[in-house]
Amino acid sequence: MAKSARHVTGKAPSSLDAHDRKKSKKKSSSMCVGSMFKSAVKRISREVSPDNNIMLTSNSIQVLCGISYDFVDTVADLAGELARKVGKQTVGSDDIISAFEILLKGELRKLAIREVHNALSKSQAKSRGK
């Protein structure tokens, strides 16, 4: 008895060969690490100028993202050092407020601390609502 040809089931063969697949892969972006703040920078620019008088180029957005990243990194490093000096393993809101008090001066300090308190009150209200 002759054996019939075995029919293999599974995925259909890809129309792209290996060389074409390498070409079609998405290139990784070469933007700065601070590009995670891109949406925040755009939102703030819309809040500052609701009638769209301010137009930001991609380079200016990258610069502002880099500045934001550096600032957040500096605050986080200082807050971490303050927490370690006290003997804590976690950074709390009081450490972040202390870092702002050390780094900033004048009206910017007051504004930053007020924003931290607003964020904390929103977070606590949200957790109470659950």
UniProtKB/Swiss-Prot annotation:
Region feature (Disordered): 1-31
Mod. after translation: Monoubiquitinated to form H2BK123ub1. H2BK123ub1 gives a specific tag for epigenetic transcriptional activation and is also prerequisite for H3K4me and H3K79me formation.
InterPro entries reported for this sequence: Histone-fold (IPR009072), Histone_H2A/H2B/H3 (IPR007125)
Ribosomal protein recorded as keyword: no
Signal peptide as annotated in the record: none
Ubl conjugation listed as a keyword: yes
Example GO molecular function: DNA binding
GO cellular component terms, A-Z: nucleosome; nucleus
Subunit structure, as described in the record: The nucleosome is a histone octamer containing two molecules each of H2A, H2B, H3 and H4 assembled in one H3-H4 heterotetramer and two H2A-H2B heterodimers. The octamer wraps approximately 147 bp of DNA.
Family, similarity comment: Belongs to the histone H2B family.
Protein name (Swiss-Prot/TrEMBL): Histone H2B
Record gene name: HTB1
